[in-house]
Amino acid sequence: NKKRITEIDAQNKLEKFRKINKNYLFPSFNTIAGTGPNGAIVHYKTSKKSNKIIKKNDIFLCDSGGQYKYGTTDVTRTICFSKQQKSIRDKFTKVLKGHIAVATTNIKKYKNGKQIDARARQFLKKDGLDYAHGTGHGVGFFSNVHEGPQSISKYNTVKLEEGMVLSNEPGYYKKGYYGIRIENLVYIKKNKKKLQFENLTLAPIEKDLI
């Protein structure tokens, strides 16, 4: 299909899919749908003025969520439509490794968000790279999608406890070119004597960017 699809088209289509679920009520925040350089704007909001056509050679970042009768969601995926240059795949892989490092954390050993945040950034930092936002925020239950006191960030020392829900969303942004972010929601679960994260988000991750 050669029809041109814009950021607003993609955003509206996603909303249409969500409405299929009878328990869906409304978005949990303004969708971030950024292609190419717009994806590098962390809190981008598309408008008629900024709206871009999603081009085959660009990567596309979409951060969205919904309020459902049974809870709140927040998910980010970065996808591609053609083979990307090695430098982009390398950055995506480093972000993914950071995401996995958070997801597999032993919370008995790393007890607060500050300690876990460092695990997420370690692979980028080896190359002198970083991202200018927290790795994760607390999430409410049919409430605020950003809800404390817990978070995974450089300065948060709140002890993480069983039953808390947070996001796991490391990223990398090259201003004027592209943005990468991978976000799941995770639940802190007790497994025998261990405290660990359990993924609540089951959307596939873009393998062609690894």
Where in this protein do the model-derived segments appear?
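Active-site neighborhoods and metal-handling regions in enzymes and metal-associated proteins
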Residues: N1-I210
